[in-house]
């Protein structure tokens, strides 16, 4: 069984929380794209964990976690993440964490270039809101064949050294001539690679073969996405996207088994909207700044990976319907419904008004999206604490009506409803 857990919106939907819950029924959890720009927060009986690179299934002792070839991996960050988890009593070894030999390495110069370019762009207000983790530059060099992969750490021989020399020579053309930096040292980069080769070579393997054999043996495999549909490099709000494919169709590819088909696609959808970074975010126009500040505080809307305040707004049915379509969802998990407990009335963006005066419920692109205005429907609030509810029929009528209205608007059944950050704070509907 191959199941994809993906984001419907801009990211930060609560994927890590749902992966932690649902992985109890799975044997393997595999990340298939992205890097340490992810911030998957999990809160359970063992404490609070923020996972950037390692799949959220790592908190279950019987689950094997896989970092797929579609990922970009910063070994320096991975070392720190493993140390932080180990300090909290989470056991990590090559037995329960496997790293694809095809995964791209995020080198120190990728991180440096990301920060330098964002600083350059910010001088003219053209910045993208990058996390400055080197993600775009890792993927860019991957496609230009000018970086190393995790498999190279297993065979640190003269041929890898020669490739590194060519890579650094090319990178220095940019770092020195465009950004005015000191040239990158080949010797320093080689020493850096040797350090992480000793540390991570035992974890590196052909995860494609591992996953294929597991699938053939009837093992249950879950694919965990990073970010949401609206940040997909092809189907997101370009150029304000990530640099990888976040959609479910890419899950088997990025994980390492491109010829396999998904059995189930579960989309994670937030009960309101949030966004980190630049670009059009129509729903935020539907609330006053004061109301957004209150929502941000109630939802603790600050980036798990960056700490940056997130932009917030009402649930956006136009964007969410598009996200559901992109992810090919069979069912949905609605998260953070409890955050809306304080509202007397709950706004929902049901359509966009365009500059020609017409309205649409289809998600537009380009200039049309830039100029769109939200059309808002107000729904009754429930104005009580629902965090202790575990059955749908025990929710207040207004909360049940909110859930069913969202189902109507996005065209997909909501099976799971999260009413708190704890592992068991979830309603499962038949």
Could you say what each language-model-derived stretch is?
Residues 1-430:
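Non-transmembrane, aqueous-exposed alpha-helical and coiled segments at domain scale
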């Amino acid at each position: 069984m191959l199941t994809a857990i993906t984001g419907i919106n801009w990211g930060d939907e609560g994927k890590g929380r749902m992966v932690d819950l649902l992985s109890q029924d799975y044997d393997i959890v595999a990340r298939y794209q992205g890097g340490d720009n992810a911030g998957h927060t999990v809160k359970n009986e063992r404490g609070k964990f923020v996972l950037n690179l390692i799949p959220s299934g790592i908190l279950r002792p019987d689950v094997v976690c896989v970092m797929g070839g579609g990922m970009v991996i910063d070994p320096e960050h991975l070392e720190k993440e493993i140390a932080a988890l180990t300090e909290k009593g989470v056991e990590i070894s090559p037995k329960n964490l496997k790293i694809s030999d095809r995964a791209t390495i995020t080198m120190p110069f990728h991180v440096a270039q990301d920060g330098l370019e964002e600083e350059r762009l910010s001088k003219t207000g053209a910045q993208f809101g990058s996390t400055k983790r080197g993600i775009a530059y890792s993927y860019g060099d991957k496609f230009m064949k000018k970086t190393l992969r995790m498999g190279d750490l297993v065979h640190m021989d003269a041929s890898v050294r020669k490739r590194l020399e060519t890579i650094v020579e090319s990178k220095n053309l940019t770092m020195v001539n465009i950004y005015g930096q000191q040239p990158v040292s080949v010797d320093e980069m080689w020493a850096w690679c040797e350090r992480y080769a000793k540390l991570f070579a035992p974890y590196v393997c052909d995860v494609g073969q591992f996953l294929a054999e597991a699938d053939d043996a009837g093992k249950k495999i879950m694919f965990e996405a990073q970010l949401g549909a609206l940040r997909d490099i092809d189907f997101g709000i370009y150029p304000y996207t990530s640099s990888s494919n976040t959609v479910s169709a890419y899950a088997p590819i990025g994980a390492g088994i491109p010829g396999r088909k998904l059995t189930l696609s579960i989309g994670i959808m937030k009960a309101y909207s949030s966004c980190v970074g630049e670009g059009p975010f129509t729903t935020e126009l539907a609330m006053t700044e004061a109301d957004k500040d209150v929502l941000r505080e109630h939802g603790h809307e600050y980036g798990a990976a960056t700490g940056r305040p997130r932009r917030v707004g009402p649930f956006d049915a136009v964007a969410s319907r598009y996200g559901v379509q992109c992810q090919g969802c069979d069912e949905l998990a609605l998260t953070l419904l409890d955050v809306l407990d304080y509202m007397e009335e709950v706004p929902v963006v049901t359509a966009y008004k365009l500059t020609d005066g017409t309205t649409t419920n289809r998600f537009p692109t380009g200039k049309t999206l830039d100029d769109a205005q939200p059309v808002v429907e107000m729904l009754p609030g429930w104005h009580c604490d629902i965090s202790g509810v575990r059955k749908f029929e025990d929710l207040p009528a207004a909360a049940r009506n909110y859930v069913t209205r969202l189902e109507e608007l996005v065209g997909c059944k909501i099976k799971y409803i999260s009413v708190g950050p704890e592992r068991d704070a979830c309603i499962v509907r038949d």
